[in-house]
A protein has these predicted regions:
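Exoplasmic/lumenal beta-rich domain surfaces
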Residues: 397, 541-550
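Primarily auto-inhibitory N-terminal propeptides
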Residues: 22-110
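Extracellular glycan-recognition surfaces and repeat-rich motifs
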Residues: 444-498, 550
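Surface-exposed, flexible coil segments in extracellular/virion-facing regions
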Residues: 384-408
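A short beta-strand segment in extracellular, disulfide-stabilized domains
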Residues: 366-379
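Extended, low-complexity, turn-rich repeat/linker tracts enriched in Gly/Pro/Ser/Thr and Asp/Glu
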Residues: 510-513, 523-531
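Extracellular (secreted or membrane-anchored) zinc-dependent metallopeptidases
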Residues: 70-72, 78-88, 93-138, 148-354
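Short beta-strands within extracellular/lumenal beta-sheet-rich domains
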Residues: 494-511
Length: 550
């Protein structure tokens, strides 16, 4: 009789994830993110206000002097970091290049819908001479397409955890970083609620060179003209534009202004495209630019359903941000940086190899002796013309030259799997570790573990995917019903979304079907907003897949 062998894994995941009303769409949470940062860093607000004062003065000076060289162009190197777990969020390079083309059209006043913009805003919409180009050299001088595809759990992006940027963004004084994710989870409650499209930080919010000087954007909003313009909107914030209805993420509530002369004060619009010619009670008086009652509904920095334009003063403000020392935006378009980032590069790159199990987001794998794992290619950075899979321990590879293959592991022990991908430019190899388990139960009958002996018990495992200081650890500083030993996690050290595992030996339940599994638990919630979770899971395939059992 074949026995089903189970291993129980106990994981405590610490997170602070609010409930979001999915039926609504929140185009932007830039000001929410900024306010959260100001609360966390008492010096940030002072730094930001000083930067804004500098930019305000520089904008006025540039507007008065109108000294911009004829036919001058601000070229900004861009890199997209696509974070994914193998799903639809792993958008294609073609989708990104199409979105970038639309952004450049918006900033060049080159859209096919320009003639439909209401006056006087059609005439106020000018070519910004700002162009965004994919970088072709990374910070180390290596060839890049300017689009990274990174298999990363941070694709479910926690806005509250500003450490998420670490290891993703490239030097923001040399690149505009756009991080594409599957979902943005805001901290606390955001006015308007709903699905978050994107956010960034205006110049001066973070210190120069900070990894957080980037745009975070939902992958689902790059699939149509007006959705793409939401990214043009976020770039506008990154270039120091405010919402036309003021420094808030909640339009339609109160009259607001962006402090620019040629954009009428407005309550703002959400999800509709009202009249630009009348009905704006916030613009009670005529000016030399617009008449009383007018509003620029079609402004890209509004929340309307018909974004089409920037104004002349908005364009001047964005040019000023790029010419300023604030966050060293002036370095982005310098000749030295354009050479270093190789924005005009055309040479193809060798691909960068990457692969994962088709049904797992783990970077290390466990399988029963004689079992198999299906691996899937997630390489990027170049067109791939060849695949070559290899594995140790006498493993059998079903399709060694395909992008997806099943590999069977006949012998217990540690081994490796490697994928080499290549094209005419070069090749690259990725190696991952696999542990093949001898599926012999470590627990064959009734047992008890009180953790009274020093160290992790024989056959048990502590798994800390984040490799940080917050992990399952032993303590003897508690009074339990059967002694003083226990395993615990110091929750104050856990980052949002962190998961840690405590794994038992293999338990033979096939011959012990009348047995039960129980454990003693002590837990206290630090605050009502914390959503810590304890889950008990079991696996029938030596850790290949897991199902919740309690």
């Amino acid at each position: 009789m074949k026995k089903h062998l189970y291993s129980i894994i106990v994981g405590l995941g610490l997170s602070s994830v609010p409930v979001i009303a999915q039926q609504a769409v929140q185009p932007c949470i830039t000001y929410h993110a900024m306010e959260e940062h100001f609360k966390a860093d008492t010096q940030a607000k002072t730094r930001y206000e000083a930067a804004q004062k500098q930019l305000e003065q520089e904008t006025i000076q540039n507007s008065m002097s109108n000294a911009r060289p004829v036919a001058f162009q601000y070229t900004v190197p861009v890199v997209f970091h696509v974070l994914h777990q193998g799903g639809a969020e792993n958008i294609s390079d073609a989708t990104i290049t199409a979105a970038l083309a639309q952004i450049n059209s918006d900033y060049a006043r080159a859209g096919s819908d320009v003639t439909s913009i209401a006056q006087p805003f059609q005439n106020l919409y000018i070519n910004s001479d700002i162009k965004f180009m994919l970088a072709h050299k990374d910070p180390n001088g290596n060839c890049t397409t300017g689009i990274e595809h990174l298999y990363d759990t941070r694709t479910v992006w926690q806005q509250a955890n500003t450490s998420y940027y670490n290891g993703i963004t490239w030097n923001p004084t040399k690149y505009l970083n756009v991080i594409i994710v599957s979902q943005i989870v805001p901290s606390g409650t955001v006015a308007g609620g709903g699905t978050i499209v994107g956010y960034t930080y205006k110049p001066g919010t973070w210190s120069t060179g900070a990894s957080q000087d980037a745009i975070v954007y939902n992958f689902g909003y790059l699939n149509s003209l007006y959705n793409m313009r939401s990214l043009s909107h976020e770039i506008g914030h990154w270039l120091n534009l405010s919402h036309t209805f003021g420094n808030t993420n909640n339009p339609g509530v109160a009259c607001g202004d962006d402090q620019l002369y040629d954009t009428p004060p407005t309550k703002g619009n959400y999800g509709s495209c009202g009249s630009s010619s009348s009905g704006n009670s916030c613009a009670a008086s005529s000016t030399s630019v617009y008449t009383a009652g007018q509003q620029n509904v079609e402004n890209i920095m509004d929340y309307s359903s018909c974004p089409k334009n920037f104004t002349t003063d908005q364009t001047n403000a964005m040019r000023t941000a790029l010419a300023s020392s604030v966050n060293n935006r002036q370095n982005l378009w310098s000749a030295t940086n354009l050479t270093a980032t190789d924005v005009n590069g055309t040479s193809p790159c060798a691909p960068i190899a990457d692969f994962y199990a088709a049904n797992s987001a783990l970077t290390s794998y466990t399988v029963c002796e004689g079992g198999s794992i299906t691996f899937k290619d997630f390489s990027y950075n170049g067109t791939i013309s060849s695949y070559n899979w290899s594995a140790g321990g006498g493993a059998n590879i079903a399709s060694p030259s395909a992008s997806v293959t099943s590999i069977t592991f006949p012998t217990a022990g540690a081994t490796t799997v490697a994928l080499t991908v290549g094209n005419s430019t070069g090749s690259n190899t990725k190696v991952r570790n696999v542990y093949v388990m001898n599926a012999v139960p470590g627990i064959t009958g009734p047992t008890n573990e009180s953790f009274e002996n020093q160290g992790v018990p024989s056959g048990w495992s502590v798994i800390n995917p984040n490799s940080n200081s917050a992990a399952w650890d032993q303590t003897f500083d508690v009074v339990c019903y059967d002694g003083f030993g226990a395993f615990f996690i110091e929750g104050s050290k856990c980052a949002t979304g962190q998961i840690d595992y405590l794994e038992t030996p293999i338990i033979d339940v096939a011959n012990n079907q009348d047995q039960s599994f129980s454990f003693a638990l002590s837990y206290a919630q630090k605050s009502s907003t914390q959503n810590d979770v304890l889950k008990v899971q079991g696996s029938k395939d030596c850790g290949g897949t897991w199902n919740e059992i309690a």
